[in-house]
């Protein structure tokens, strides 16, 4: 695998800024050297990048994206191709998108559809959170299957959007119990959808439909 040595830059890490050179082999950061140590040790590389005056940072991970998401008769404007290309230009090297499953739909088919959308179309690495619309016996089984066989480690549940994604407290509890057994993480869209729908209807009845009332 090709080796790349990034020299003379300022490395930004969780511990601060460091005058450090970075040796990369393939897609792995192989070593960090204090300034000048790489030369002293006669470290060789296929390509040397002079990053003088620049910051060197790890690739960002965007853990909440919505590529090609259909919702409410509209769709997210970014495709996996355009969205991940923009991400790469901004220094993001991994996204975690939301694979979609609504009431009455099969969880496996929802994940497979998102793989079809993303496969071969991404400029960066990608993974998926799995949205589950309405918890039932089958989706509880599917959660564990996806953890054990499909590499899914997190599930998105909703307290909003009745009839589309909504799960009640009992359903959410059962999903959390299942996640405690299979090691997954539960993420919550924690808005009270039932109350919101009442408020929306009241606003509409009063004619309060300007964007400012959305807040």
Task: Spell out what each predicted region is.
Residues 107-111, 137-147, 196-203:
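Distinct, well-ordered alpha-helical segments
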Residues 105-112, 164-175:
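Active-site-adjacent beta->alpha loops and helix N-cap segments on the catalytic face
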Residues 51-121, 138:
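Metal-associated gating/positioning segment near the N- to mid-region
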Residues 82-105, 119-134, 149-164, 183-187, ...:
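Divalent metal-dependent hydrolysis catalytic cores, especially in the metallo-beta-lactamase
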Residues 90-92, 116-125, 193-215:
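Active-site gating loops and adjacent loop-to-helix segments of metal-dependent hydrolytic enzymes
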Residues 139-157, 176:
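Extended substrate/RNA-proximal surfaces in nucleic-acid metabolism proteins
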Residues 2-5, 10-58:
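Histidine-rich, glycine-flanked metal-binding segment
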Residues 41-52, 84, 142-145, 172-189:
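Short amphipathic alpha-helices and their capping/turn segments at secondary-structure boundaries
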